[in-house]
Amino acid sequence: MVFSSYKLPDLPYDYDALEPVISAEIMHLHHQKHHQGYINNLNEALKSLDVASATQDLTGLIAINPALRFNGGGHINHSLFWEMLAPQNKGGGTPPRHELLKLIEKFWGSFDNFLKNFISSSAAVQGSGWGWLAFCPKKQELMIQTTANQDPLEATTGMIPLLGVDVWEHAYYLQYKNARLDYLKNFPSIINWDYIESRFVEMSK
C-alpha cells in the first residue's frame, strides 16, 4: 500500500487578516513552521508505514502509531482551525443563526453562556491541547470537549469537531505571553460561524 503525501493547505486569508487578535507573526509561524512540521513528520511516518506493511513487520507497524496519531492529528486539527477563523471584516465573530444557534441555546441557555463555558474549559487544559465545540451524531447533541496534545477529536471520541481553539503555546505565546485566558477572551471575535454552521448542517443530516 502506497500512501499519498499530504501538503500544507493555503490559508483562506492573509497572515495579518486576524490582527489584532492574532498577529501576523504568529500566523506565519503557526502555518508555515508548525503545521508544515506536522505534515513533514506525517509523510515520513507514512513512508515507514509503507515499508513495515510491505514487509509485514507487525512490531514496526505498531511502533509507527504514536507518530501517526500525533502528526496526523496535528494536520487534521490545524486544517480545520484555519477554516474556523475569519477576519472581523469578513464575518469573523458574527454569531451563528438558524438551527445551530437554537441548539446552543438549548444546551447552554444562551450564546454568551456557551462562550463563557467554552473559554473556561479551554483555559483549563493542562499543558498543550485543544478546546472543542463537538457534535455527537448518535445523540444529536452538542458538547464542549477538550483533547490533549494533537489528538484528533473525531478519531479518538467519535465526536464531530465544529469549533476548535488551539491552546498550545505556539498559538499565542509570542503575543500574549503566559496569558492564555486573554487570548481565549479575544478569540470569539474571529470565529467563522458561517463555516461552522455549514459543517453542522452537513454533519447533522
Curated annotation (Swiss-Prot):
PROSITE patterns: SOD_MN. Homodimer. Binds 1 Mn(2+) ion per subunit. Keywords: Manganese, Metal-binding, Oxidoreductase. This is Superoxide dismutase [Mn]. Its EC number is 1.15.1.1. The keyword Oxidoreductase applies. One of its GO terms (molecular function) is superoxide dismutase activity.
